[in-house]
Amino acid sequence: MGIGEDQMQGSSGREEKIFVSVRLRPLNVRERARNDVADWECINDETVIYRSHLSISERSMYPTAYTFDRVFGPECSTREVYDQGAKEVALSVVSGVHASVFAYGQTSSGKTYTMIGITDYALADIYDYIEKHNEREFILKFSAMEIYNESVRDLLSTDISPLRVLDDPEKGTVVEKLTEETLRDWNHFKELLSICIAQRQIGETALNEVSSRSHQILRLTVESTAREYLAKDKFSTLTATVNFIDLAGSERASQSLSAGTRLKEGGHINRSLLTLGTVIRKLSKGKNGHIPFRDSKLTRILQTSLGGNARTSIICTLSPARVHVEQSRNTLLFASCAKEVTTNAQVNVVMSDKALVRHLQRELAKLESELSSPRQALVVSDTTALLKEKDLQIEKLNKEVFQLAQELERAYSRIEDLQQIIGEAPQQEILSTDSEQTNTNVVLGRQYPKLRVRSSWESLNITPESPLSAQASIMISPQSTEHGSDENVFQLSDLRLNSGASSPAQHLAFVTPGKFTKVRLNIRGVESKNQLHIHKGESVDQSRVQGERLHEMDEPSEVDSEDTCTELQCIETESPGIIMYPEPNILPDRCKAVSALPLCEPESKNSRPPTETAEEKEEKEETEEKEEEEEERVKEVSSVSIQTKEKSGPIKVSPRCVLSLTDESFPDESSNLKRDPTHQDFVTPSPEKLYAWHLESNGQTAGGTGFTRSRSCGASFVSSSSFSLSERDANTPPCWYQNERAESNLKPSNSKRPPLPKHISRMSMPATWFEKDFNHTQRMPAGLDGVNMIKSSPNGSQVSTSKSHVYARQTSGRALISQDEGEETVPQRDKRIIHLSMEEIEQKFLALRSSKSFKDAAVDPIQDYLTMPLNWPLEFKRLEMEIIELWHACNVSLSHRSYFFLLFRGDQKDCLYMEVELRRLKYIRETFTHNNKAIENGRTLTSMSSLRALNRERYKLSQLMQKKLTKEERENVFLRWGIGLNTKHRRLQLAHRLWSESKDMDHVRESASVVGKLMGFVDMDLASKEMFGLNFSLRPRAKKSSLWKRSVLSLSIL
């Protein structure tokens, strides 16, 4: 039997009616003994008639002749019944079509006798077909069940527990945990069939000595696959099922004389057969109304066979005896209804990849032919609905446009209000032909409402040779001192960064009211080399500023002040250079003389930069030549060869930055600074800022302090409040530490917290420096070694608590840090303690990097900074176990644990993050041990609050399981974690088992995998470790996160 490709596809199927046949058995021994008369007779192969003994009036109530697809008389054998009534349907299974064969009738009418023979003949023919078609490989699977008292039981199993009937979206109705045996040969089938006969429920009644008391369903699944890919019609896997259903017979209790158990069994049998008859009757009238398939287990299991994707044959058995006339007539009525039921059988194909490709190619060719042929005009029956839909869409879009316009208007009014508050009237935009300038102004104006773009840059075009003019041009006006502590003024003038052309200097002024530190950036494009000159001006006299009170200007700026960052992105060219000039000190009288000059004076819209004279052009050329000479001298001193490619490119941004600095000293002013360690106007920035001081050895006074950047470099300017706070946090110990430090200098014998010995070199730290106990926070941080600490006394005078020391002992350069100390609160102290370890790490990095070349620092800064143990994998495992135990003790968020565990997998560069996490956890544990409160990211943490947060997170994870995982995935996870599928609150059980064992690494790894899947973590190999937040949690982060920004910036510099 060949199976064509089109037939196997069966996409639409074919409709056909159920094949109904009637088998009339002869009178049995009991009926002949009672001298019963046969009232039914087969007059031909399709008609059965009733030889009525009733009167003419009674005959008119019932039909006397019934016509079906095939009628078998008493002389017909079971072989004939199979060949002409069931063979074609049963053998459809080898063609990939589902099939079902029913035996329906009253009790003792011969149903079981008929179905046993049909089952044997069908299996024999299937095996004969398999032997004749060696080109395909066949797999036969056999299962059997019975429905006894509306309970489904497995006939191939000794377990009599009932089975559940489930609905599968692909397979339809299935029986859970039903045994399915793969047949080896014919003998194996006969053995299984004998087991089914022995397991089936039977009983004796007055009508039948061996009466079936249950409905039996024998199911055979046939799968066939082509052995070789030889022809287009032999490429797919066919899967189909044939059911042999032997129904229990309907009976009357008055005739069967049943009682007790037999009466109960008969009631269930009649009820299920009544539901079957109702389903058949409604299907015969069409499938429009409700079909009660779920009213009985029998109809629910056979739903596909009765009116779905299957070919069905029903054999109705009759008893000719007059005593059973009414039961026989009901059977014929059932058969008449079943004859009108239509099924839609389809070929069930599991297509292989090659077959799927061919099918798609054929579909593609069909679609291409349709496209190539001229399209027929589409007739739109009703255009009113389409027009209404379009009108609604237009109205919706108009509303959105109106709302966006209102939001834009409010945004512009907000900008104008802010400009009026800071004392600068709104300026109208000046139309410019330069598209880059226009785009920059628009973007900066929307993202930074306090950012004012100057239309002229000539007033700030100051070269390093004119420090007085530079200082005068950026002095703070009295009006600017009225800004709040969170207010920052950032000026950007004419941001036209043309890397290939030589253009006048472009300046940016950044003002922080806390210390009124000015940083001016001169962005120059000199031929093919872009150099960024940073001039750090002098501070305004502190005595003049202390008299003026800084107040808050508006509430929104106070909330967002710590989060506001103005980032200066690096200009990626082939060979960028950045030169930093610490300008000489200016005497207080000079400061007073120029302090009246305003910082940012509004310019009229008609102002234009003056035309350059010949003298100015010559001065610029001389300045550029001097700068090139200084750059060459710096390259020779540092022994760094910077290869340049004469190429001009666009501005690009990259998140990482490596800075290396050399020294440029000014003989007079720098010496004054070194002699005066308490000078207020010279502040060395902390490592979190965009530069780091690196002083060359031998005390030489070289030209230009320069540092080189990598091609991907990003630096950040923080706002005023966060700038001053970060500077204080980076270099200032807690107030209790200062007091005891001062006491230790005065009374060494009474000191309880001895500071770190100053004669110990930073390079002599042990390789396992991360093993140092973080609990001893009373020791002096490494970041404070060699720092002048100035403490304010009650009368306003300043007392120096230590002498100046060399900052990095590997070099002979000097960097002095001077800052004001003020009173701090307990939350500020807690925040600082966490970051002292970070400061120590960063200071070590700066100290160690000074002994490396620029090339080494740029290529692998982390390896230069870290002194790795000899066996890092073992050390990583030890640190990992310690961190996991601390996570468990401190009730750390499960999402943070999982993200950290999956992200850091033992790379040598991960030791920095392991150390930071370890110290943070030790601090939290120490705080919880003393029943104190820890402050992290602006939140107060206690042992109980962290435990409550952990329980809330577990509850949220249990909710995510319902959304993120399918039912099958959830069941697999429950089984893998030892949670029974029949238990309650399975998701909560799993959530509370996650991360519950801190010493079992398999448990930890599996917990991290589950949480990662629920939280939707991306591939950890692609994640940016530099930007990883050590406080990662389910809850949204608070707005004020300047403390975290400092940590992220520090890690990005590394």
Swiss-Prot record:
Keywords annotated in UniProt: ATP-binding, Coiled coil, Microtubule, Motor protein, Nucleotide-binding
Example of a GO biological process term: microtubule-based movement
Coiled coil regions in record: 350-425, 611-640
Region (Disordered): 600-648, 740-760
SUPFAM superfamilies, per database record: P-loop containing nucleoside triphosphate hydrolases
Gene3D superfamilies for the chain: Kinesin motor domain
Record bears the keyword Cytoplasm: no
Record field: compositional bias (Acidic residues): 613-631
Start and end residues of each Kinesin motor domain: 17-341
InterPro entries linked: Kinesin-like_fam, Kinesin_motor_CS, Kinesin_motor_dom, Kinesin_motor_dom_sf, NACK_C, P-loop_NTPase
Positions with a binding annotation for ATP: G105, Q106, T107, S108, S109, G110, K111, T112
GO molecular function, a single term: ATP binding
One Gene Ontology cellular component annotation held by this UniProt entry: microtubule
PANTHER family according to UniProt: CENTROMERE PROTEIN E, KINESIN-LIKE PROTEIN KIN-7G
Family statement drawn from the similarity comment of this UniProt entry: Belongs to the TRAFAC class myosin-kinesin ATPase superfamily. Kinesin family. KIN-7 subfamily.
Protein name: Kinesin-like protein KIN-7G
